[in-house]
Design a protein with these regions (language model features):
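A short, Lys/Arg-rich alpha-helix, primarily the initiator
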Residues: 1-22
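Hydrophobic micro-packing sites on short alpha-helices
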Residues: 55-63
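The alpha-helix within a helix-turn-helix
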Residues: 20, 31, 60
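Short alpha-helical DNA-recognition segment
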Residues: 23-42
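Interdomain hinge/linker segments and adjacent boundary elements that couple functional modules
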Residues: 50, 62-72
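Residue-level signal for the short linker/turn that defines the boundary of a DNA-recognition helix
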Residues: 14, 24-25, 51-54
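Residues within the helices of the helix-turn-helix
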Residues: 17-18, 28, 57
Length: 72
């Protein structure tokens, strides 16, 4: 299944990792900014864990993403 949940999680995780990298943050720094453990950021970025929309918004805020199209 090319568009199953696991594939979508990995794609979202890769996009979030790229945004974090563009913000010049390590996963540990990003985790501290949002009050999580680094392992949670890592699990989200690898697609090993699902992510709630509210958590995505927290990360986007931490990464300074203001583009409304990226935030959808």
């Amino acid at each position: 299944m090319q568009n199953g949940p696991a594939v979508r999680r990995r794609k979202l995780g890769a996009e979030l990792r790229a945004l974090r990298t563009s913000a010049a943050l390590t996963s540990g720094e990003a985790a501290r900014l949002v009050g999580w453990h680094q392992s949670k950021v890592s699990r989200i970025e690898t697609g090993a864990s699902g992510v709630k929309p509210a958590d995505v918004r927290l990360l986007l805020d931490a990464y300074g993403v203001a583009d409304s199209q990226l935030r959808e």
